[in-house]
């Protein structure tokens, strides 16, 4: 019997494939994105030391929710926190999500606020 896998299972497989290639260092940490039904979470991770350097989510930002405006607010917030810690270059880890909509808005807001990836 052929069954269709859920989109979240397929996303996790894509994420594992990406994680074999993408890793963050102390000079260029990894910007990780997680998207839930209600909120958007972003964290900057140093994979060599396995520590989270800074994080932001749509609960902290002015715009609650998981829409494109919230993604832009979270992107600006994480860029502000990263620049305060002296982080300018990051590796973008989209966690298997398509580079479209909220993920693209978040990345564009980070770039506009001064992060480079």
From Swiss-Prot:
Which InterPro entries does this entry report, sorted A to Z? Answer: Ribosomal_uL18_bac-type, Ribosomal_uL18_bac/euk
Q: Name one GO cellular component term.
A: cytosolic large ribosomal subunit
Q: Which GO terms describe its molecular function?
A: 5S rRNA binding; structural constituent of ribosome
What keyword terms does UniProt attach to this protein? Answer: Ribonucleoprotein, Ribosomal protein, RNA-binding, rRNA-binding
> What family does this belong to?
Belongs to the universal ribosomal protein uL18 family.
| Cited NCBIfam families | L18_bact (TIGR00060)
**Oligomeric form and interacting partners:** Part of the 50S ribosomal subunit; part of the 5S rRNA/L5/L18/L25 subcomplex. Contacts the 5S and 23S rRNAs.
Q: What is this protein called?
A: Large ribosomal subunit protein uL18
The organism of origin for this protein: Onion yellows phytoplasma (strain OY-M)
